[in-house]
């Protein structure tokens, strides 16, 4: 059997900006509440249409878990690494807080964690995934914006969505090859 290739597929048209994903992430990963440090966030996109027919969309985002991760390439201590199934992680014990990875990340998805004394980012809830569970942001979303799955499994919901819908990845011109896919 081939290795797993985890990814998250996002249907942003379903996002209500309820922040359940952000709260679940902070709680699951012990990120201090109220702190400006976020492993994921939701951006309000510009209003579309004309009054009275206006439409608001939101774009959830987080670390893109890139196949060609610039943060990993610049890390002098190799604290940033990629697991065999595609998750880009940080070994807090190796991080020297040089912040080179923060500067290299085109998605602005890293922050300094005083709790860990290291740069921190989304882990795609690897601890949950290893237990056979979904990341907290995926599980908690009331409108099911995020779908987590193994793209090497053609029967996974994530694979089926990508096969049946048009999609894009953020900042594709940077050649980072993100593992987050946004449905059109």
Predicted segments, located by residue:
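Non-ligating segments of multi-cofactor redox enzymes
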Residues: 1-184
């Amino acid at each position: 059997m081939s290795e797993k290739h985890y990814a998250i597929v996002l249907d942003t048209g379903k996002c209500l900006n309820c922040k359940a994903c952000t709260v679940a992430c902070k709680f699951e990963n012990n990120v201090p509440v109220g702190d400006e440090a976020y492993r994921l966030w939701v951006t309000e996109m510009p209003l579309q249409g004309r009054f009275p027919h206006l439409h608001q969309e939101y774009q959830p985002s987080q670390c893109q878990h890139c196949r060609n991760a610039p943060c990993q390439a610049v890390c002098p201590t190799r604290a940033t690494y990629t697991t065999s199934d595609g998750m880009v992680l940080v070994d807090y014990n190796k991080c020297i807080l040089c912040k080179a990875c923060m500067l290299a990340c085109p998605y602005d998805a890293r922050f300094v964690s005083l709790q860990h004394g290291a740069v921190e980012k989304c882990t795609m809830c690897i601890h949950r995934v290893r237990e056979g569970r979904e990341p907290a942001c995926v599980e908690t979303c009331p409108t099911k914006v995020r779908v987590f799955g193994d793209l090497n499994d053609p029967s996974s919901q994530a694979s089926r969505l990508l096969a049946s819908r048009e999609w894009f990845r953020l900042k594709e011109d940077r050649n980072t090859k993100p593992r987050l896919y946004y449905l059109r």
